[in-house]
């Protein structure tokens, strides 16, 4: 018995709890299993009996510390004697909340030196009161980072939890999440240890000293996958689902978890459409359609971590590879958006098979070479506008009948009307709604993205600054007045004049203000490629004249002739266009001039300023401005760091564009005088 305990402790210290729960431990050449996963309907009876033998238990006021023997944890949940979750319970009636007191307790009174709080020894640590719940996967003193585990208000109205007529707002935690089957599902299908391989591309030993973070689902991620699986089990094959999740939702992980779980789904009854048998899986393959190379590798790494045979996964970069993967019955096939036409044709030719088509409509097709390939195949130029992936997919679907042997799952943050009508749920009044919603407002309020409209102003709005300064004498200094004269008294009708305003602001208010620990960058958005080229020349000329220590880059597709001279992105930047995003990461490159390319699907957390001289409306306006919303905690990035100066559009049109995706947005019509001093 002591040998067993010793080996368990050694494996926990070396590999962590997730590994121990998912793998055998070996004691004197005898293999022991410490947890049996939840079976599917297709599993043997013996597997179901083993799962039933798992012992889940709860203790109250659990002592745990050799350092502070009197310390107690309010609640600990175990499986087969291994702690899974700790919970600190707070009561607002005694003026204690989870958001403050619960988190403070973990940060200040729970030492990571105590075994139960060693990183990787538990799956998550919860701070809970009757209104809200929060969790962390790593107790790390003052650096402990908590995330909300809340449902969000109805209809995307923001963070928190809705009123529960039958009890506490957080009752869902014990009624639905901390239950035997759900906990087992989380252990087997959601929790992962990240060793940093996806980012670095290097293989490392999967031991705790190399572990970077423990991945645990937020509530909306667990909820969307659970609801989708439940609906498919009931209905069967052939439905379309729209998952409208904002940036900051962790969409990549949600998509990955869905792919892994959907291939194991069995029908709940034979009434489920295209069900073959109650113990037979509904889908032959899940096809993930994406253009994000990072997501491609992330899916592969995650599924490998889940213990799935890599022989069941295929990467289809060509039509031939895609055809072979489908014919060979690969369970998970990862392909690109430009292969979507071939997918539609291929699956219609194998009508006896069922497919789950998971579309990552992250609008990332505009961020790289893959975009150019798809645009070429559709005779579309992204720099002529309207070239994001859901428009392309929508066009393809109109040209091809959607196969009834497929279920379609579309993930997007900003669905267009056509996408909503094709994939959404129609209510009794004829309105369409997404199957699942995680709104921009909730993401902002929970701190996962920033509010890009916090400091949005039109050029005309600068006139309001004059009165602000007159009414606030403390700001009426020579520096402010000099800046205002240059900005307000000039009507910038020419590109050169507008470029001077842009560079003046960026250099004085962003670069020399050392925003983001002196890492801040900007994007200039122009109406077309010709304007982009002219802006690039104007900005570069001024930067050279002023001897500024940073460069301006440009991004556009193809070749463009301006004033009799031919230009390409690669020639202007001095390196291949496939390297533009990577080169823009360098400190020396601070401003990126674009027309349409990089307006969607481009994630650069250092972007803090945007200068717009282009008509924007609807979804494209939201997508463009959202280039600034990525958080960067390591750089201290907050909404107040952002600044958008718009020479073309109105505050009213921007509010109208954002309203469908962000309820109750507050949009200031004029910038506050304080921008002169930030």
Question: Where does each model-flagged region fall?
Answer:
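Conserved C-terminal RecA-like helicase domain
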Residues: 486-594
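Conserved RecA-like ASCE ATPase "motif II neighborhood" in helicase/translocase motors
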Residues: 330-361, 365-376, 383-398, 573-581, ...
């Amino acid at each position: 018995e002591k040998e067993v305990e010793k080996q368990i402790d050694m494996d926990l210290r070396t590999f962590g709890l997730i590994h121990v729960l998912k793998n055998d431990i070996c004691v004197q050449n005898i293999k022991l299993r410490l947890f049996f996963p939840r079976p599917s309907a297709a599993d043997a009876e013996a597997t179901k009996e083993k799962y039933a033998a798992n012992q889940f238990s709860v203790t109250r006021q659990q002592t745990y510390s050799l350092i502070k023997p009197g310390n107690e944890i309010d609640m600990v949940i175990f499986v087969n004697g291994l702690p899974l979750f700790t919970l600190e319970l707070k009561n607002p009636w005694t003026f204690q909340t989870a958001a403050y007191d619960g988190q403070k307790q973990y940060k200040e009174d729970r030492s990571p030196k105590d075994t139960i709080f060693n990183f990787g020894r538990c799956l998550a640590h919860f701070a809970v009161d009757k209104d809200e719940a929060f969790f962390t996967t790593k107790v790390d003193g003052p650096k402990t980072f908590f995330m909300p585990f809340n449902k969000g208000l109805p209809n995307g109205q923001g963070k928190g939890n809705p009123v529960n007529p039958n009890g506490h707002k957080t009752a869902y935690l014990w009624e639905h999440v901390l239950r035997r089957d759900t906990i087992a599902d989380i252990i087997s299908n959601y929790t992962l240890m990240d060793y940093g391989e996806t980012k670095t591309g290097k293989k490392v030993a999967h031991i705790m000293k190399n572990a970077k973070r423990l991945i645990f689902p937020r509530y909306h991620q667990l909820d969307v996958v659970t609801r989708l699986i439940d609906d498919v089990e009931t209905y069967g094959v052939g439905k379309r689902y729209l998952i409208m999740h904002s940036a900051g939702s962790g969409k990549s992980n949600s998509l990955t978890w869905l792919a892994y779980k959907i291939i194991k789904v069995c029908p709940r009854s034979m009434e489920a459409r295209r069900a073959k048998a109650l113990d037979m899986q509904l889908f032959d393959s899940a096809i993930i359609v994406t253009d994000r190379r990072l997501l491609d590798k992330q899916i592969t790494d995650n599924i490998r971590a889940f213990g799935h045979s890599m022989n069941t996964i295929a990467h289809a970069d060509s039509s031939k590879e895609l055809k072979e993967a489908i014919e060979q019955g690969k369970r998970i096939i990862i392909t690109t958006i430009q292969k979507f036409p071939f997918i539609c044709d291929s699956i219609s030719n194998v009508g006896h098979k069922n497919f789950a088509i998971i579309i990552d409509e992250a609008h990332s097709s505009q961020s790289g070479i893959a975009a150019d390939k798809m645009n070429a195949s559709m005779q579309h130029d992204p720099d002529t506008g309207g070239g994001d992936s859901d428009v392309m997919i929508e066009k393809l679907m109109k040209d091809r009948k959607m196969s009834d042997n497929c279920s379609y799952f579309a993930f997007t943050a900003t669905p267009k009307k056509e996408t909503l009508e094709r994939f959404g749920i129609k209510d009794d009044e004829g309105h369409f709604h997404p199957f699942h919603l995680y709104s921009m407002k909730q993401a902002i309020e929970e701190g996962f993205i920033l509010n890009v409209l916090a400091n949005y102003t039109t050029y005309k709005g600068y006139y309001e600054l004059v009165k602000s300064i007159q009414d606030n004498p403390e700001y009426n200094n020579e520096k402010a007045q000099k800046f205002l004269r240059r900005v307000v008294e000039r009507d910038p009708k020419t590109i050169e004049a507008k470029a001077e305003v842009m560079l003046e602001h960026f250099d004085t208010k962003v670069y020399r203000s050392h925003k983001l620990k002196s890492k801040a960058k900007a994007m200039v958005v122009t109406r077309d490629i010709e304007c982009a080229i002219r802006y690039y020349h104007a900005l570069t000329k001024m930067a050279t004249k002023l001897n500024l220590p940073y460069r301006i880059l440009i991004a556009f597709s193809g070749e463009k002739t301006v004033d009799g001279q031919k230009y390409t992105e690669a020639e202007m930047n001095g390196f291949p266009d496939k390297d533009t995003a990577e080169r823009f990461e360098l400190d020396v490159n601070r401003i990126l001039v674009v027309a349409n390319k990089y307006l969607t699907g481009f994630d650069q957390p250092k972007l803090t300023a945007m200068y717009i001289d282009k008509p924007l409306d609807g979804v494209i306006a939201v997508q463009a401005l959202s280039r600034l919303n990525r958080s960067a905690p390591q750089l201290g990035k907050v909404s107040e760091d952002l600044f958008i100066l718009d020479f073309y559009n109105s505050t009213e049109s921007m509010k109208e564009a954002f309203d469908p995706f962000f309820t109750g947005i507050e949009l200031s019509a004029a910038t506050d005088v304080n921008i002169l001093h930030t």
